[in-house]
């Protein structure tokens, strides 16, 4: 009864008003799995390729009708009749059908939509919550959220070089209390911005996007917001920064426009280290460009014992690249973005490889999101311990937090909130 009898794709709209793809997978039993695919703004060069139409007369060339056609035609024909519970085999079939190194022929967006929809259908067929279907009986850890409070870089129309300034409520007793903490700090930050006559418009991921004179101003204001909301900076609420440094790395230097600086790798690492000394920063993402492996080595040697160093662009959720990084002792964490690699199986493999190497895995959204909540189930199903899914505003972000709250309720007394133990690779 779990045989696939129909696959249907359509073009829908993401949180930035751009087209993306959604797929339905129908099983013989009548069960339906539906999944939609996110899209990034800061896209690494190593990511699997999403297929866009290039027709400037529709959506400025960003349409996905070709990807939809590939699902409704070639992909549908290939997986019709297959058992939806055989996720690894189906994903392998999709990869081989595409035949390219980076899924550029059929489109990683087309392949991923089907891969995720298959898993959802199989979970429904098995009468299991999706997180339980993915992870089994030991799936009980609620992840610590990285909550975006201030947007910059390509995620906002302001002068900040850094892409995200986040809070990490690692000292709270439960996911529910962590979400409450995030909402309260977010509200307090709004008040502080109003007092400074700064705008409270939000960026792609729901964080505020004010025009600060320097990058560091964001950190000082976040610490103030944490304190005035009634929480302890550091012990209860830490800070994370996504530099997205590949975006301002040119000609071998890091160009910080808002600060008027042009820094070598060593100088930029000193710059970040000075922040770590002054503020309760526990996580830095893409602190060095994906092109600067030597710089990554220096950063890891300098801060890797006390700060989580998350590789996003450099690893691209790709086990081949992650293995290279592990062998060279680069970073100590990987950001997991399902659309960077293009199938559920490869996503789960990347999480497993990271854990086996003592790296942490942070399951992440993209700046262009949909109402799909599957990353919440992946985070719990794999016991990934950390999730990054935006601010406490915009329904496309809150959908994931609300799904985590439902999962916590479903787990009942078995549920455990990861808290500070989520950063197991760091020395106390």
Curated annotation (Swiss-Prot):
Organism: Nitrosomonas eutropha (strain DSM 101675 / C91 / Nm57)
GO MF, any single term: magnesium ion binding
Gene: eno
Keywords from the UniProt entry: Cytoplasm, Glycolysis, Lyase, Magnesium, Metal-binding, Secreted
GO biological process entries: glycolytic process
EC number: 4.2.1.11
Family recorded in the similarity comment: Belongs to the enolase family.
Residues at the active site: 205 (proton donor), 337 (proton acceptor)
InterPro entries per UniProt: Enolase, Enolase-like_C_sf, Enolase-like_N, Enolase_C, Enolase_CS, Enolase_N
Cofactor (UniProt): Mg(2+)
Pathway the protein takes part in: Carbohydrate degradation; glycolysis; pyruvate from D-glyceraldehyde 3-phosphate: step 4/5
Database matches in Pfam families: Enolase_C, Enolase_N
Major location (coarse): cytoplasm
Chain positions recorded as Mg(2+) binding sites: 242, 285, 312
Protein name per Swiss-Prot or TrEMBL: Enolase
Annotated compartments: Cytoplasm; Secreted; Cell surface
Role, per record: Catalyzes the reversible conversion of 2-phosphoglycerate (2-PG) into phosphoenolpyruvate (PEP). It is essential for the degradation of carbohydrates via glycolysis.
CDD domains xrefs: enolase
Residues involved in (2R)-2-phosphoglycerate binding: 163, 337, 366-367, 388
Signal sequence annotation: none
Catalyzed reaction equations: (2R)-2-phosphoglycerate = phosphoenolpyruvate + H2O
Cofactor note as given: Binds a second Mg(2+) ion via substrate during catalysis.
SMART domains assigned to the protein according to its UniProt record, in alphabetical order: Enolase_C, Enolase_N
Recorded GO CC terms: cell surface; extracellular region; phosphopyruvate hydratase complex
């Amino acid at each position: 009864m779990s045989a696939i009898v129909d696959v249907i794709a359509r073009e829908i709209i993401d949180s930035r008003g751009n087209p993306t793809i959604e797929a339905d997978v129908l099983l013989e039993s009548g069960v339906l799995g539906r999944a939609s695919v996110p899209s990034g703004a800061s896209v690494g060069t190593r990511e699997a390729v999403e297929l866009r139409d290039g027709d400037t007369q529709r959506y400025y060339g960003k349409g996905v009708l070709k990807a939809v056609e590939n699902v409704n035609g070639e992909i549908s024909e290939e997986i019709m009749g297959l058992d939806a519970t055989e996720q690894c085999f189906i994903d392998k079939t999709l990869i081989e059908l595409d035949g390219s190194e980076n899924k550029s022929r059929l489109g990683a967006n087309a392949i991923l939509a089907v891969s995720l929809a298959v898993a959802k259908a199989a979970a429904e067929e098995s009468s299991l919550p999706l997180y339980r279907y993915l992870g089994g009986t030991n799936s009980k850890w609620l992840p610590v959220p990285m909550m975006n409070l201030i947007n910059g870089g390509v995620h906002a129309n302001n002068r900040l070089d850094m892409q995200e300034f986040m809070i990490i409520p690692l000292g709270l007793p439960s996911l529910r209390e962590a979400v409450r903490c995030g909402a309260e700090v977010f509200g307090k930050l709004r008040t502080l911005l109003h007092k400074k006559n700064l705008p409270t418009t939000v960026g792609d991921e729901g964080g505020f996007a004010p025009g600060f004179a320097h990058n560091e101003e964001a950190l000082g204001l976040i610490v103030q917001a944490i304190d005035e909301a009634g929480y302890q900076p550091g012990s209860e609420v830490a800070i994370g920064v996504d530099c997205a440094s590949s975006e301002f790395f040119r000609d071998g230097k890091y160009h910080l426009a808002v600060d008027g600086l042009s820094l070598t790798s060593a100088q930029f690492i000193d710059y970040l280290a000075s922040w770590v000394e002054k503020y309760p920063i526990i996580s830095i993402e893409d602190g060095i460009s994906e092109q600067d492996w030597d710089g990554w080595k220096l950063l890891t040697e300098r801060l890797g014992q006390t700060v989580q160093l998350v590789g996003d662009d450099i690893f691209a959720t790709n086990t081949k690249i992650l293995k290279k990084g592990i062998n060279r002792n680069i970073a100590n964490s990987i950001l997991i973005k399902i659309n960077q690699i293009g199938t559920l199986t490869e996503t789960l493999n990347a999480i497993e490889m990271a854990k086996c190497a003592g790296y942490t895995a942070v399951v992440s959204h993209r700046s262009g999101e949909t109402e799909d909540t599957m990353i919440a189930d992946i985070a719990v199903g794999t016991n990934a311990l950390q999730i990054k899914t935006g601010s406490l505003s915009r329904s496309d972000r809150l959908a994931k937090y609300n799904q985590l709250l439902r999962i916590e309720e479903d787990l009942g007394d078995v549920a455990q909130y990861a808290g500070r133990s989520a950063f197991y690779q760091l020395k106390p």
